[in-house]
């Protein structure tokens, strides 16, 4: 059994609260099936176009595969997560929606101290109408570096994060950054390809892993602007 509680606030425009629980069954030590139920409530103190208070009930069926082995500082990782869901959004009317979320990670060891690391994240929401405050948020360390955390929203999004990693010591690696993303927002009728590049480093401490990534995000028809460079900082620890 699992449970979740998530609160997301977009300035003073809206606030979304999501509660849920799920059950899972291990088919093998590396694979499992999941069944999740979530309830989402959105409030909008500031009325705006395409922003409306709603509640949403959603049922998801998920499949996960995960294989991980540790070789020095590198995790040789293969992960696939697929979740499909049906939801009902209630405002003045009731709308039935379909969604799919995919996350895939692949690490390829070239030698004892070099590795290529790839990560894909895909989201698709199909609906007869959309609200800005129900769209998924993207951008940042886990989806598209070089852009602010959760600064992008869309009903269709797919990103590929790529790194070439070099390990000069057992507790440190240096990595390049090249991220590419396709984004489509049916509310604004915008469809763009975004990308970013940069470099980073990760090192082990006594408490966990500290990651620093410096990346510059580029939009269509825009040249390089150093002011668009963002430093992403994360600290991972296991309790």
What are the language-model segments listed below?
Residues 11, 90-93, 184-187, 220-223:
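A generic structural signal for short coil/turn motifs at secondary-structure boundaries
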Residues 27, 67, 120, 142, ...:
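A broadly conserved detector of short glycine/acidic/proline-rich loop/turn motifs that flank catalytic sites
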Residues 6-8, 85-87, 181, 215-217:
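Short strand-loop junctions, especially beta-strand C-caps/beta-turns
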Residues 15, 96, 193:
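Short, glycine/acidic-rich beta->alpha junctions
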Residues 1-80, 137-140, 151-154, 166, ...:
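Gram-negative/organellar outer-membrane beta-barrel architecture
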Residues 188-239:
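C-terminal beta-signal and terminal closure region of outer-membrane beta-barrel proteins
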Residues 56-168, 176-180, 184-185:
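C-terminal outer-membrane beta-barrel translocator/porin domains of Gram-negative envelope proteins
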Residues 1-2, 29-35, 69-73, 111-116, ...:
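Repeated loop/turn-to-beta-strand initiation elements of outer-membrane beta-barrel proteins
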């Amino acid at each position: 059994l699992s449970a979740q509680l998530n609160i997301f606030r977009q300035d003073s425009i809206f606030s979304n609260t999501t509660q849920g629980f799920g059950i899972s069954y291990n088919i093998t030590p590396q694979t499992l099936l999941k069944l999740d139920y979530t309830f989402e409530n959105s409030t909008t103190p500031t009325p705006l176009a395409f922003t409306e208070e709603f509640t949403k009930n959603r049922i998801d069926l998920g499949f996960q595969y995960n294989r991980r082995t540790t070789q020095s500082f590198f995790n040789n990782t293969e992960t696939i997560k697929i979740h499909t869901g049906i939801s009902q959004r209630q405002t003045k009317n009731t709308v039935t929606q379909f969604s799919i979320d995919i996350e895939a990670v692949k690490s390829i060891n070239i030698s004892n101290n070099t590795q290529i690391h790839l990560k894909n994240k895909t989201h698709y929401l199909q609906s007869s109408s959309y609200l800005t405050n129900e769209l998924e948020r993207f951008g940042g360390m886990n989806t598209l570096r070089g852009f602010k955390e959760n600064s992008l929203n869309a009903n269709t999004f797919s990103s590929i994060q790529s790194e070439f990693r070099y390990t000069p010591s057992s507790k440190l690696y240096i990595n390049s950054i090249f991220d590419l993303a396709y984004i489509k927002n049916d509310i604004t009728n915008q469809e763009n390809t975004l990308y970013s590049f940069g470099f980073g480093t990760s090192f082990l401490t006594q408490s966990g892993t500290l990651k620093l990534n410096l990346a510059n995000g580029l939009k269509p028809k825009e040249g390089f602007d150093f002011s668009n460079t963002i430093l992403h900082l994360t600290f991972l620890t296991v309790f």
